Amino acid sequence: MTLAPADLPASLQPLVDRALARLAQVLPEPIPANLLPLLTRLAVTSDFALDTLVRQPALLAQLAAPGCPPIPAPVLDPLQPSDWPAQIRRWRTAMSTRLIWRDLTGLDDVAQTLAGATALAEDCLRLALDALQQEFAQRHGVIADEHGIPQQLVVFGLGKLGGGELNFSSDVDLVYAYPQGGESDGPRPLAAEEYFARLGQRLAKLLDETTVDGFSHRVDLRLRPFGSAGRVALSFAAMDQYFQREGRDWERYAWLKARAVAGDIEAGEAWLQTLRPFVYRRYLDFTALDGLREMKAAITAEVARRELHDDIKRGAGGIREIEFLCQALQLIRGGREPALRERRLLVALDALVAAGQIAPEDGSALREAYLFLRRLENRLQMLRDAQTHVLPSDALDRERIAVGLGYPDWEVLRAALAVQQQRVSTEFAALLAPRKGQAAPDALANYWRSLPEGSNAPLLAEAGFLDANGADQSLRDFAQGTGVKSLSDAARARLDRVLPALLHAATRSPQPDAALKRVLGLLQAVLRRTSYLALLDEQPSALARLVDVLARSALLAERLAAYPLLLDELLDVRVSGPMPDAAGMLAECQQVLAVEDPESALRWLNETRLALSFRMAMATLDGRQGAVDSTRQLAELAQAVVVTVLAMAEADMHAAHGEIPGGRFAIIGYGSLGGLELGFGSDLDLVFLHDNPAGVDASDGARPLEPGRWYARLAQKVMALLGAVTAAGRLYDIDVRLRPDGGKGSLVSSLASYTEYQRERAWTWEHQALVRARGVAGDASLLADFEQVRAQTLGRERDTGVLYADVLKMRGRMRTELDRSDAARLDLKQGAGGVVDLEFLLQTGVLARSARHAALLQPRDTPSLIDALAVAEFLPEDTAQALHGAHATLLDVGLACTLDRRPRLAPTTPAIEEACAAITAACIAAELPFA
């Protein structure tokens, strides 16, 4: 909108006339007619801008130039330091006026205005610091580090400066630091602490002090360690010590946006990486809400005390509430989700929506409100270059703000503001809703608080516990344990709220006694990590979901107790949504390849695997997907992990020993991994292959290895990484006994020796195993060669009499040695009509028919093999359908046993009997009477 003089409200006409008359007096020529509408609007919007044009009349032509280009920065003469304040201030006021001009002409939107104000502050900081550093170097010398390289002051920008969102007339929150101690080498030497403190103070004065030319930027140094009482500049080591010992919750919010903005930016950004664990805790951290409640309470008290109810920053529904809301969610989850570690608010808001932590419609509403409030804030400050966030009380100022923003009057603007503030208040209140305390403690709460001295088994029996005496004793033991006794007052208060709620939830579960036992086991594991108590205290839905899961799954109870980070999954909206596909899981796993520290990368990969497999378990437990889908997903996840680990191992080998020029390496998955039917906790059957070109005798690195040793070392690294114990457990147990010649054979086989072995020496059972084998990682061309070897091996003509005899003999031996069935229960895997009978039937069909039916060589998983063998007429169609149902039934029951930590020995229900009968009948019809 460009306000024409004819559109100007009569009440504003005198103000505009006076402003334009002042400007006309200093201009060498009359005001161009084409600029009158814009200058009219400028006069309405900003006394500061008009004052600047009056003092710097040549600026008007620069602003009116096409595109409104930047004003060149001044050159500060090191011989004339007395001129620096005026030069910096005049440039800053000119560039600030340019920001207003670009806003009014529509060249910049709100976000660009905020970014422009930030860039201007940084430019002023760097301009001033560069000049001062030259002065200090001449007077005091420089301070070199241990390598003789001169050190620089590091200037951290916090708050909106760090986030690149500085409002028009904002102060700048700065913290000064320097890499290490020492003494300057000039004629008047200073110790590092004094040197950089003086430099920082001079910098603040050069920018902050008000002169006849105004000021550049108000500087606030109070966010430094120990606040106003602390040293002005600290070494990185002193900063580390402070945050390890003294860092408080509110400082996590302050440093979330921190950025090195001047001085040695590279060193500053590197140090900020070391601060990340302080800001973003490794685990889900609902304790961040405690700090937020304290800060919000302090601000609310200040608003009331100073009567700042019209403050659009600190008041209800204001800018600060949007910032707090986003930052709290970032702090809660940023340790687990790197995408949330974002300084810029709008980008963080988008990331929170993408992560499912803010609903898309709420995210859009918050974005709209934020931009509205920031635009209004800028216009309040543009009026007189004042650091204000309070709506004006003066009627003329109100009208100027409203008209400048395109509203007909103040009341319409105020109504629009109220709508946005209400949106923000609603979202913020939902995040910080006070916990609903019980009006009066109930019987179970009173019982818990009486422990360990008290005892009330009858109450527990009445509540629904079958073994009430045992439950009473377990709770008393827990209450008098060192873990509970050593809790802080705040953590004990959380436990006193959480445990009665857990007891209530346990009594409503199908198995109260099992639920209680598992609840106490979990609490024992998390007592020292108060962030998990905070999660259960702050999130009643997670608490109820937790007890439900604990009651139904011993396996998940164990995993939650061992790896409490999985509690996050109970709150993640993705846990009840669709699982990522194979490509999505690979992408999640391969994010760790960007992590430089191998130990951290491996822990992160373990955490990713735990989280994804937990989601699969939840989907299975809830009945949202069957075991056939879950076991396929588990195999795809394992493959993604193997691909990632191979990349890590190869990078390590390349760094240490170089590459084998032209060499190829691949990993083959056998068993349930190859057959896409992996269970929870299953090991991985792997075979390693390599192919080395003729004439290459060694790797090309600084410490060369001959090819055989190089590939063996690579395979060993893969196995070591997969089996390494981290804080998040180990990835997988590995079994490599299916390689040629088993335990006696080489760990890594050449393609040629593998081909020869399969052709000349492999047993029938090894060819059966090859039916499910597939390449899972490594060189694509070698994997293609493996497929060709596999096809040639499986597709050759066979003596069916010998084949059937070998299969029957092997199955009989396995049945004798491995079947654990008894009169009342069936071994789902090894029993008569069980999963292995079905696998042997399908493998025999492939070996018997694939010479004439090449399509049988493609499938690896059981459902696809059944379909392919039906097409090849090895199985009648009705038999194939019956086998699909039988397979799904046995897999569902088996996975249910695994999830509840029961052996896969199931009572023979009608469904199981029907499944086993179908498999047995199919085997007999195929002349494979395994029973």
Swiss-Prot record:
Its cofactor is Mg(2+). The keyword Transcription does not apply. GO terms for cellular component: cytosol. Residues 1-434 are annotated as: Adenylyl removase. It catalyses: [glutamine synthetase]-O(4)-(5'-adenylyl)-L-tyrosine + phosphate = [glutamine synthetase]-L-tyrosine + ADP; [glutamine synthetase]-L-tyrosine + ATP = [glutamine synthetase]-O(4)-(5'-adenylyl)-L-tyrosine + diphosphate. The keyword ATP-binding applies. Residues 441-931 are annotated as: Adenylyl transferase. One of its GO terms (biological process) is regulation of glutamine family amino acid metabolic process. It is an enzyme of class 2 (transferase). Its EC number is 2.7.7.89, 2.7.7.42. Keywords: ATP-binding, Magnesium, Multifunctional enzyme, Nucleotide-binding, Nucleotidyltransferase, Transferase. InterPro entries: GlnE, GlnE_rpt_dom, NT_sf, PII_UdlTrfase/GS_AdlTrfase. Belongs to the GlnE family. Involved in the regulation of glutamine synthetase GlnA, a key enzyme in the process to assimilate ammonia. When cellular nitrogen levels are high, the C-terminal adenylyl transferase (AT) inactivates GlnA by covalent transfer of an adenylyl group from ATP to specific tyrosine residue of GlnA, thus reducing its activity. Conversely, when nitrogen levels are low, the N-terminal adenylyl removase (AR) activates GlnA by removing the adenylyl group by phosphorolysis, increasing its activity. This is Bifunctional glutamine synthetase adenylyltransferase/adenylyl-removing enzyme. It comes from Stenotrophomonas maltophilia (strain R551-3). The lineage of its organism: Bacteria, Pseudomonadati, Pseudomonadota, Gammaproteobacteria, Lysobacterales. The gene is glnE.
